Regions:
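Intracellular juxtamembrane helix-capping segments at the cytosolic ends
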Residues: 108-120, 308-322
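Conserved MFS/SLC helix-loop-helix module at the cytosolic interface between two early adjacent transmembrane helices
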Residues: 53-92
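C-terminal transmembrane helical hairpin of 12-TM major facilitator-type secondary transporters
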Residues: 270-314
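Paired small-residue
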Residues: 81-84, 92-101, 294-302
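A late C-terminal transmembrane helix in Major Facilitator Superfamily
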Residues: 320-356, 362-363
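Helix-to-loop junctions at the C-terminal end of transmembrane segments
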Residues: 54-67, 256-268, 351
Length: 410
């Protein structure tokens, strides 16, 4: 696996740590900014909206520069957003910080996943994406608990200062180890490539795959966005125990992502069907027994194993239905974050009238639709397991697998 894939994973880790930090800092943020838990929950929604709307726009703007320049530009924007978050003294200032970091994170995800897919042979794209998305799982495994722990001991501001430092480190690794393609397209080629990238969005199977990703992620984030208050206020765990539980949840997501990444290329349809079905079952169990500590932890870990860990299989499905180009992957990331918007936003709206258990029930509804949305792809052998050669979207100057390496041009 090219070293650049692991560097991109480090970048994903940094982005995800910032994205998820709010979930572990809800009580401190609510007290400091003078708002309720539901308002802090909307910070997750704001981040997701910024990702969905601003991410593709930033990606389009960066199509005219080299991939490494695009990534470094994103790191600068992301760094500025985290500095704003660390120094925020009001809720509006924190909202502004979440908008800036959300836009940057989404563009990074799309460009990074696109590079991963083009760095390797088609038969191991799912595995490469899985390696990069280990940054997502490690962000949950290490980043979220560390942010929660630092926020509890040193104040929530310290968590965002730490993320700013991580951003500098990730940018340095990118500058040192990620290289540009051997040949970059000129302006006419960029226009041709953009036309080709937009054309694939007329494909029904791509649109269905995008919608399916929204439902899969929405099912998990309806619960995950409020996991800390659920564990403390319903399950009865103490504040010192929650970081350990979040660490266990992160370990479950890391394990699940490794397994899914290895199976995603040859068993895409089966992985998605089994994963979404299990996620539905675990959400039902969590909703019923959230107030009983041991079963609550078991079902929480189950959701960690099969929730957001479907990402490598989801990415392979989208790339087969569309293409491996940056815009397709960024739009896919936008549909994923649309699931975050729906899960966290509707969950926040339900809490005042129905309590903290309501977001889990909402997740069950999303999970039912997610299972149904996977079924049509099972009839298509190419989407299900890639049994016929992939047909890439024609584009002038597009890179072929293996054309990017440490020895490519700067």
């Amino acid at each position: 696996m090219p070293a650049a894939v692991y560097v991109l994973a480090a970048g994903v880790f940094t982005m995800v740590t910032s994205e998820f930090a709010v979930a572990g800092l809800m009580p401190q943020l609510a007290d400091s900014l003078g708002t309720g838990i539901e308002q802090i929950g909307y910070l997750v929604t704001v981040f997701a909206i910024a990702m969905t709307v601003g991410g593709p726009a930033l990606t389009l703007a960066l199509l005219r520069v080299t991939p490494r320049t695009a990534l470094l530009t994103i790191f600068v924007i992301f760094f500025a957003g985290n500095l704003l978050a660390a120094s925020a003294t009001s809720y509006p200032a924190m909202v502004a910080a979440r908008v800036v970091t959300g836009v940057a994170a989404q563009a990074f995800f799309g460009i990074a996943i696109s590079l991963c897919a083009r760095l390797v042979d088609p038969g191991i794209r799912g595995r490469a994406v899985g390696v990069a998305l280990n940054g997502l799982m490690l962000g949950t495994l290490l980043g979220l608990p560390l942010a929660t722990l630092i926020g509890g001991r040193l104040g929530w501001q310290a968590a965002f200062w730490g993320i700013a430092v991580l951003t500098v480190i990730a940018a340095g690794l990118t500058l040192a180890l990620v290289r540009n393609p051997v040949a970059e397209p000129d302006s006419a080629e960029v226009r041709t490539r953009l036309t080709g990238e937009l054309a694939v969005f007329r494909r029904p199977q791509l649109l269905l795959a995008l919608a399916s990703s929204t439902m899969i992620i929405g099912a998990t984030f309806a619960m995950f966005s409020f996991l800390t208050p659920i564990l403390t206020r319903i399950s009865g765990f103490g504040g010192d125990t929650v970081p350990l539980l979040l660490l266990a949840y992160g370990a479950a997501t890391l394990l699940g992502n490794i397994v899914v990444g290895r199976l995603a290329d040859r068993h895409t349809g089966g992985v998605l069907l089994i994963g979404t079905t299990l996620n539905l079952a675990f959400l039902v169990g969590f909703a019923l027994l959230a107030d009983v500590p041991l079963p609550a932890v078991v079902f929480m870990l189950g959701i960690g194993l099969v929730g957001i860990t479907m990402n490598p299989a989801m990415a392979v499905r989208v790339q087969r239905a569309g293409s491996t180009r940056p815009l397709v992957n960024t739009v896919h990331a936008s549909f994923i974050t649309l699931g975050v918007i729906l899960g966290s936003g509707l969950g926040s709206a339900l809490i005042p009238g129905h309590g903290l258990r309501a977001p889990i029930v909402l997740g069950i509804g999303f999970a039912v639709v997610a299972v149904i949305s996977v079924l049509p792809m099972l009839r298509n052998p190419h989407l299900r397991n890639g049994t016929r050669p992939e047909v890439e979207m024609p584009s002038v100057g597009s890179e072929q697998p293996g054309t990017m390496s440490a020895g490519a041009s700067n």
